[in-house]
Amino acid sequence: YLDHGLGAPAPYPDPLEPKREVCELNPDCDELADHIGFQEAYRRFYGPV
């Protein structure tokens, strides 16, 4: 393993990240996600994840 000064390797991209951002931009979805989790909140507002 060689360290080229780039820091830690990038984590795998989250395939749900775009949907997570949509939910976070909706105050109601964001609030519900705090209580029941993002995937369930997204499903209630927008349909299947």
Swiss-Prot record:
Regions annotated as coiled coil: none
Residues annotated to bind Ca(2+) 1: 17
CC per GO annotation: cytoplasm; extracellular region
Domain of life where this protein originates: Eukaryota
GO MF annotations in UniProt: calcium ion binding; hormone activity; hydroxyapatite binding; structural constituent of bone
4-carboxyglutamate modification, residue list: 17, 21, 24
InterPro entries in the cross-refs: GLA-like_dom_SF (IPR035972), GLA_domain (IPR000294), Osteocalcin (IPR039176), Osteocalcin/MGP (IPR002384)
UniProt binding sites for Ca(2+) 3: 24, 30
Role played: The carboxylated form is one of the main organic components of the bone matrix, which constitutes 1-2% of the total bone protein: it acts as a negative regulator of bone formation and is required to limit bone formation without impairing bone resorption or mineralization. The carboxylated form binds strongly to apatite and calcium. The uncarboxylated form acts as a hormone secreted by osteoblasts, which regulates different cellular processes, such as energy metabolism, male fertility and brain development. Regulates of energy metabolism by acting as a hormone favoring pancreatic beta-cell proliferation, insulin secretion and sensitivity and energy expenditure.
Name listed for the protein in its UniProt record: Osteocalcin
Encoding gene (name): BGLAP
